Design a protein with these regions (language model features):
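Short, hinge-like loop/turn segments at secondary-structure boundaries
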Residues: 106-108, 195-197, 227-230
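Conserved anion-binding
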Residues: 116-154, 158-164, 172, 179-180, ...
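Active-site beta->alpha loop and helix N-cap motifs at the rims of alpha/beta catalytic domains
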Residues: 1-161, 244, 250-253, 260, ...
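Catalytic-face loop-and-helix region of soluble metabolic enzyme cores
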Residues: 203-272
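Residue-level detection of beta-strand scaffold positions
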Residues: 47, 176-178
C-alpha cells in the first residue's frame, strides 16, 4: 500500500522515521543508506522523513555547527531504491520565485521519483522572502495535473490559531501534518481539540497529524532542540540533565508518557483526528 493510501485511511497507524541526509564525513550515500537499511529492518516504518537543513539567522548562533549534507531528494531516492520504503522530502519553499520552485518540485517528482513532500515556510514572518508562501506553493502544486504528489505541512502546536492554519493548508492541498517535537502534551491537546471543532463546523474531515518525538542522549541535544524552538518544560529539562548517565532512558520514558497523555485525551473526548508518529533521530545533528 502506498503512503498516500495509508495517510488517508484514518484507522490505519502510520509511523515515519525522520533522519538527516548524511554529512560529507559520513562517507558515501550508498554506505550511509545501507546502514539506515540495517537499522530499519528491525522495526516497522511506513516512511522516511528527510528534512531540509538550512542556516537560520533569526534563531541566533547555532549550538551545533551546520555541515554540508547530501541533497534530501537524492538521499530520498537512494533510500527508496535500497530500503524499499517511501521517502518524504521536506522543502523550504520561500527562497526562490514560484516558477523556479515549481520546476524544482516537478523535477523532484519525475526525475527523483519522490511522491511525498512537506512544504515548509520561512523561519520568520518578519523576513521578506522572494518565494511563495506555503499556501501559495500548496495551491500551485494542487493545480498541476502532471504531478503525482502527496503534500504535507508543518504544525507548531504552541502557535496562536494553529488549528485555523491547518484548515487553510488543508484547503490548499495539504493532506497531513508533522508537528514540532513534543516534550509536553498540553499544547498539542489544545490544538487537536480546536482542530476537530473547526473541522466539525466546516463539515470537513480532519487530516492526519503525525506527532513528532525526538529522544535525547546529551545536553547538547537539548540545547539544539531548544534552538529549533522546541518547548521543553523546565521540570522536564532538569530531570533529564540531572540524570545525564541515563538520559536516553529517561527521555524515552517522558516521550511515552506524553504520547499516552495525548492518546488518553483523544479517546476520552472521542476526537476523530487521525494521528501517527514521526520519530526523529537527533543524535547525529
Amino acid at each position: 500500500m502506498r503512503l498516500k493510501d495509508k495517510i488517508k485511511r484514518p484507522r490505519r497507524p502510520v509511523v515515519a522515521y525522520e533522519i538527516l541526509p548524511p554529512r560529507e564525513k559520513d562517507g558515501t550515500l550508498n554506505s550511509y543508506a545501507s546502514n539506515i537499511s540495517s537499522l530499519l529492518s528491525q522495526t516497522h516504518i511506513d516512511a522516511i522523513n528527510i528534512p531540509e537543513v538550512r542556516d537560520e539567522v533569526a534563531r541566533g548562533e547555532r549550538p551545533i555547527k551546520n555541515q554540508i549534507r547530501a541533497e534530501p531528494r537524492e538521499f530520498g531516492k537512494l533510500l527508496q531504491d535500497i530500503v524499499g520504503i517511501e521517502a518524504i522530502v521536506n522543502r523550504v519553499v520561500v527562497h526562490q520565485n514560484i516558477e523556479q520552485e515549481m520546476k524544482w518540485i516537478e523535477e523532484t517528482n519525475s526525475k527523483y521519483e519522490i511522491e511525498n513532500i512537506i512544504t515548509v515556510g520561512g523561519e520568520s514572518r518578519e523576513i521578506r522572502y522572494p518565494g511563495p508562501t506555503v499556501n501559495q506553493a500548496l495551491h500551485a502544486i494542487s493545480q498541476n495535473d502532471s504531478l503525482n504528489l502527496l503534500c504535507g505541512g508543518i504544525s507548531i502546536p504552541s502557535r496562536d490559531r494553529e488549528s485555523k492554519r491547518l484548515i487553510e493548508k488543508s484547503e490548499n492541498g495539504s493532506e497531513f501534518f508533522t508537528t514540532q517535537v513534543l516534550y509536553d502534551a498540553s499544547n498539542i491537546i489544545k490544538m487537536i481539540t480546536h482542530y476537530q471543532k473547526r473541522c466539525d463546523e466546516k463539515n470537513t474531515f480532519p487530516r492526519r497529524v503525525l506527532l513528532s518525538f525526538a529522544p535525547v542522549s546529551s545536553e547538547k541535544n537539548i540545547k539544539f532542540l531548544k534552538w529549533l524552538g522546541v518547548e521543553i518544560p523546565k521540570k522536564t529539562e532538569r530531570l533529564l540533565i540531572e540524570n545525564s548517565a541515563i538520559m536516553s532512558e529517561k527521555s524515552m520514558g517522558i516521550t511515552v508518557s506524553v504520547l499516552n497523555e495525548i492518546l488518553s485525551h483523544l479517546d476520552k473526548n472521542k476526537i476523530k483526528v487521525p494521528i501517527g508518529l514521526n520519530v526523529e533521530h537527533i543524535m547525529s545533528y
